Amino acid sequence: MGKYFGTDGFRGEANVTLTVDHAFKVGRFLGWYYGKNHENGKAKIVIGKDTRRSSYMFEYSLVAGLTASGADAYLLHVTTTPSVSYVARTEDFDCGIMISASHNPFYDNGIKLINAAGEKMKEDVIAEIEKYLDGELGEIPYATRENIGCTVDYTAGRNRYMGYLMSLAIYSFKGIRVGLDASNGSAWTLAKAVFDALGAKTYVINAAPDGTNINANCGSTHIEVLQDLVRREHLDVGFAFDGDADRCLCVDEKGEVITGDHILYIYGCYMKDRDKLVGNKVVTTVMSNFGLYKAFDAVGIEYEKTKVGDKYVYECMSENGYRIGGEQSGHIIFSKYATTGDGIITALKMMEVMLAKKKTLSELAAPLVIYPQVLKNIRVTDKTQAQDDADVKAAVEAVANALGADGRILVRESGTEPVVRVMVEAGSTEECEKYVDQVIDVIKSKGYAV
């Protein structure tokens, strides 16, 4: 993780942490860097954005930087992160840029960089961008006259992505009542258009973005809103997306939440039944619920655990050829169809399993028993020092020994904040609370808490 770019791009409060000057310079660098690969010096870069008020401001700044360095900028306008990835990897683009802070509040924003393969940008390129932002690379020449880049409205790319999504459905959705929570974000028109075209009866909420209501008490981080809709309208299933629609959580016909762990279990079993689960493995992160692994053990599915972050999940999948992986939060990667988490593809695949198995989502998820989990964050002066402290480690080991085979404890640093996260899974919420507080009390007693 660098000074500016974290595990999911350059993210922070608009014009405080991430400024228009930063965006302009990122554009300047990318236009120059990729232009060197072309005889005419002209790179071709595609840009998407979410519905935040500041996304337009950052789009203009990036375009100014790109075209000033001689690159052509292709604008998908409001779209999803996975659509930028799809367009970048299926057309002749040098890279893609998504302007979004994902599930964060409207006043934050971010710049996500995607390479020509549709993957998150490699660390060596990010390192060079950081050097340029810090003034270590000197001046980049400005393009002049006919060498100044062009700006192209490229809604055709977004439409092609929508067609691709529809091509993935192997069953008609006719007669199925589906709830969609668009989080007032990138999926606000796209998700409904896809499900309507496939024949579903859609009930859409939080699809009226105004620049400040993205993720505001809605979407995958406020799943209770969709739960209420599913119960009130007696729907068959519901899907909730986050601000840039790279994640999806589900609600079954009873109004109960289906997490990313449930999705991994349901699709992993579906693939195993069809002898298509490569390596007989599903990729998870260390934050997946203890119950998921017990459920996998019961059906003979093996698993890999990575660090938290869909970037690490994808790297493991890519290196080993695995087909399914993801996070509890709903970042699910179907590597046959995408190189990133894609909330709409996740929803389509859950529909496919329901229709193929002729079962409800609650029936498909039933064998997975989720263990009670308590996760608490503590702000600290130095997250690495706090986590590595000998007394803190001893407290963690004591909890692990007390839990034995009936639970687990995980202590880790946040990738984006000065925070240590303490998580316990056990037989009861009370037991989880007790053990989490034990560790946090030690962190506080050692003077690390802010």
What are these regions (language model features)?
Residues 48-50, 180-182, 252, 336, ...:
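Short glycine-centered, acidic/aromatic-flanked micro-motifs in structured strand/loop junctions
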Residues 44-108, 193-251:
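N-terminal small/polar loop signature for handling phosphorylated ligands or for N-terminal nucleophile
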Residues 5-6, 47, 73-78, 98-99, ...:
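General beta-strand structural signal in soluble alpha/beta enzymes
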Residues 237, 274-450:
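Phosphate-binding and adjacent anionic-ligand microenvironments
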Residues 127-162, 167, 253-326, 332-334:
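Proline/glycine-rich low-complexity loops and linkers
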